[in-house]
Amino acid sequence: MNRKVAIVTGTNSNLGLNIVFRLIETEDTNVRLTIVVTSRTLPRVQEVINQIKDFYNKSGRVEDLEIDFDYLLVDFTNMVSVLNAYYDINKKYRAINYLFVNAAQGIFDGIDWIGAVKEVFTNPLEAVTNPTYKIQLVGVKSKDDMGLIFQANVFGPYYFISKILPQLTRGKAYIVWISSIMSDPKYLSLNDIELLKTNASYEGSKRLVDLLHLATYKDLKKLGINQYVVQPGIFTSHSFSEYLNFFTYFGMLCLFYLARLLGSPWHNIDGYKAANAPVYVTRLANPNFEKQDVKYGSATSRDGMPYIKTQEIDPTGMSDVFAYIQKKKLEWDEKLKDQIVETRTPI
């Protein structure tokens, strides 16, 4: 039986779980698939594994697909934690076949309700596609003295990839970076690559993801690794729902469906539809023919049918961003020498 290993960061999110569900549905027959669940804390690991087991038992794949589980405790805002995650992977796995970089941390501080109401009434479609009323904190640094969102969504995952490159090469892996519909170039200043001066650090981090992908996918291809960047469209997210009550959440859903009815392809609403593109590029796309310098998006038609829609990526600033991140990587290679500790606990 052929063995494959899949690491999904942010497995406990709505999108992360649905990526795993779709991977289970589409994986080849007669495969033993090890799903490496990632989390910052151990209690959440078992909860997520139980959810995946429940889906698998109902999926109709029990007879032709064997799955097992492992876990990885990693906090991408802590570079020692990132190094320990590499240490754990290096001890246990010779090859990795899938890596889904589903890092989507934001430092939200609520909603500008006056601005939200104004946007909804003046341009409802734009209000639920490219909202500007989400309040994000500015200037937040990690304990490693980096921009928190820069480290969480970009540098931490990139550093992890650089460390496990031998395993990814042996597995002829697919790397999938999860970007966003809101990764417009306007959200990133090359004078603020760590996103410390902006009030749109989340969106800026996704722009960095786009550029980092463009800067690296060709070299990875030479190693037999296929890297893609995707965006899941717009869907219900647990992380932002905490700022909504029952009525505002229901209102948001109504506006999402209205936007889809008015022709928006990006209002997937459901996390399962949002996970379409991440799994499409690993299971259905042909890397010999399909372009890797575009972004693959999860889209949905007016009548709710999911499909894939590609978007061009503006490469402006790619070289500057890559040079900055490479320099930062060398700095942390030096800082992290001999700083590995054992963190695993049996589950």
UniProtKB/Swiss-Prot annotation:
CDD domains per the UniProt record, alphabetical: 3KS_SDR_c (cd08941)
Primary location group: endoplasmic reticulum
Signal peptide extent: none
UniProt keyword terms in alphabetical order: Endoplasmic reticulum, Lipid biosynthesis, Lipid droplet, Lipid metabolism, Membrane, NADP, Oxidoreductase, Phosphoprotein, Steroid biosynthesis
Keyword Repeat included in the entry's annotation: no
Pfam families for the chain: adh_short
Membrane topology: Peripheral membrane protein
UniProt subcellular location: Endoplasmic reticulum membrane; Lipid droplet
In-chain residues carrying the UniProt-annotated modification Phosphothreonine: 345
Pathway participation: Steroid biosynthesis; zymosterol biosynthesis; zymosterol from lanosterol: step 5/6
Subunit structure: Heterotetramer of ERG25, ERG26, ERG27 and ERG28. ERG28 acts as a scaffold to tether ERG27 and other 4,4-demethylation-related enzymes, forming a demethylation enzyme complex, in the endoplasmic reticulum. Interacts with ERG25 and ERG28. Also interacts with ERG7, but only in lipid particles.
Job of this protein: 3-keto-steroid reductase; part of the third module of ergosterol biosynthesis pathway that includes the late steps of the pathway. The third module or late pathway involves the ergosterol synthesis itself through consecutive reactions that mainly occur in the endoplasmic reticulum (ER) membrane. Firstly, the squalene synthase ERG9 catalyzes the condensation of 2 farnesyl pyrophosphate moieties to form squalene, which is the precursor of all steroids. Facilitates the association of ERG7 with lipid particles preventing its digestion in the endoplasmic reticulum and the lipid particles.
Similarity comment text for this entry: Belongs to the short-chain dehydrogenases/reductases (SDR) family. ERG27 subfamily.
Annotated protein name in UniProt: 3-keto-steroid reductase ERG27
Originating species: Saccharomyces cerevisiae (strain ATCC 204508 / S288c)
Organism lineage: Eukaryota, Fungi, Dikarya, Ascomycota, Saccharomycotina
